[in-house]
From Swiss-Prot:
GO molecular function, one term: acyl-[acyl-carrier-protein]-UDP-N-acetylglucosamine O-acyltransferase activity
Quaternary assembly: Homotrimer.
Protein name as annotated: Acyl-[acyl-carrier-protein]--UDP-N-acetylglucosamine O-acyltransferase
Entry's localization field: Cytoplasm
Species: Pseudomonas fluorescens (strain SBW25)
Function per UniProt: Involved in the biosynthesis of lipid A, a phosphorylated glycolipid that anchors the lipopolysaccharide to the outer membrane of the cell.
């Protein structure tokens, strides 16, 4: 029995693995590649160039690989690359890149993108991230591994969301969020660190305590960023987790959420 519903429309140039499932009324355009074990639900639109890896599931009414609405876009060939084992829920929109950046939007592996979330052009999402319902990423946003953006989180273009960070519901992020930091509010403010997430992922208590001390250096001692980075040199040499935190601050181009 065919795994492709006869009511689906698939461009002859699209490349689908033999066991890909496609639901009714979905449209798969030219230049789309889909890896093995992936399930495309009903009423999904996939536009290329888009490469989707293995064992993904895309739910109904999602639009994946559409042209960017960026006013600079003039029809140049750009792409979307999606890795493996992602879940993309109902009504999600993901746009391809622009030639002014990498010409590519990237979604890594093992991510959960929940209903009505939006991933803008040229954004780069790592692995094991969760974008909760109605989260919206503007263009050129980077989200590192294990970050969680709660429902209705808004992220300004070019922001960098650090690994293992967490945003509360309705947070509006306009500056970079360092690794491990939790942010809340509109505009976003740093409140603490994602200690519960660290414990769930097996971080040692020693590493968690070191990060707690590092957070206080940056956010509680009234230091400038440069002064705080200097004070973190020694603990960063002892704890790789503190090094990740410090590096994410040092790499910031928009300034960090305070």
């Amino acid at each position: 029995m065919s795994l492709i519903d006869p009511r689906a429309i698939i461009d002859p140039s699209a490349v689908l693995a033999a066991d890909v499932e496609v639901g009714p009324w979905s449209i798969i355009g030219a230049g789309v590649e889909i890896g093995e074990g992936t399930v495309i639900g009903p009423h999904v639109i996939l536009k290329g160039p888009t490469r989707i890896g293995k064992h993904n599931r895309i739910y109904q009414f999602s639009s994946v690989g559409e042209d960017t609405p960026d006013m600079k876009y003039k029809g140049e060939e750009t792409r979307l690359v999606i890795g493996d084992h992602n879940i993309i829920r109902e009504g999600v929109t993901i746009h391809r890149g622009t030639v002014q950046d990498r010409a590519e939007t990237t979604l890594g592996d093992h991510n959960l993108v929940m209903a009505y979330a939006h991933i803008g052009h040229d954004s780069v999402i790592g692995n094991h991230c969760i974008l909760v319902n109605n989260t919206a990423l503007a263009g050129h946003v980077h989200v590192d591994d294990w970050a969680i953006l709660s429902g209705f989180t808004l992220v300004h273009q070019y922001c960098h969301i650090g690994a293992h960070s967490f945003s509360g519901m309705g947070t509006a992020i306009g500056k970079d969020v360092p690794a491990f930091v939790t942010v809340f509010g509109n505009p976003a403010e740093a409140r603490s660190m994602n200690f519960e997430g660290m414990r769930r992922r097996g971080f040692s208590e020693e590493a968690i305590h070191a990060l707690r001390r590092a957070y206080k250096v940056v956010y509680r001692q009234g230091l400038t960023v440069d002064q705080a980075l200097t004070q973190l040199l020694e603990p960063a040499a002892l704890f790789p987790e503190v090094a990740v935190f410090r590096d994410s601050i040092q790499a910031s181009t928009r300034g960090i959420t305070r």
